[in-house]
């Protein structure tokens, strides 16, 4: 999973303008990087210009996906990723970026500009392109699911470790003095019920 580009573009006029962007070109060869960077900007301007206010869309191009979110204020966020990057974290990140951009740069600052200006950059984009390479950083639900999976793995390992010492759960149940005869019988019946069925 990889993020290659995060951009904020003005799409309220006829000419779409890239206001702030960051690119991760580390996976491309040195001589390819300039062309790839130009193509990412061109792709972003094209899809941003064709995305209506309030609309979200994901556009596939080769091995890449451009996730686009246009806001009613006249700006649009574009995230270019590989195909494996999940959609929900992509839009969560775009929403965060656009919210922060509008706080840092209200529309009055960029509505009438005709070319990119360094004063309109969002410095946090450099941090975000590194941090959100892991999509669980952008998506709380995904992060909780990952933590639950890790807990489940730990629980399975703990049970396996007890059984690896040469003790079987059946033997422990039989030897246990704290279990009543009824509890032992319940355990054995439950084990029989959960075992594979025999076809006669």
From Swiss-Prot:
PROSITE patterns: LONGIN, SYNAPTOBREVIN, V_SNARE. Disulfide bonds: none annotated. Residues 7-129 form the Longin domain. InterPro entries: Longin-like_dom_sf, Longin_dom, R-SNARE_YKT6, Synaptobrevin-like, V_SNARE_CC. GO terms for molecular function: SNAP receptor activity. A lipid is attached at residue 197 (S-farnesyl cysteine). The keyword Cytoplasm does not apply. Residues 140-200 form the v-SNARE coiled-coil homology domain. Keywords: Cell membrane, Coiled coil, Lipoprotein, Membrane, Methylation, Palmitate, Prenylation. The modification Cysteine methyl ester is found at residue 197. GO terms for cellular component: Golgi apparatus; plasma membrane. GO terms for biological process: endoplasmic reticulum to Golgi vesicle-mediated transport. Residues 198-200 form a propeptide. A lipid is attached at residue 196 (S-palmitoyl cysteine). It is found in: Cell membrane. SMART domains: Longin (SM01270). The keyword Amino-acid biosynthesis does not apply. Belongs to the synaptobrevin family. This is Synaptobrevin homolog YKT6. The gene is YKT6.
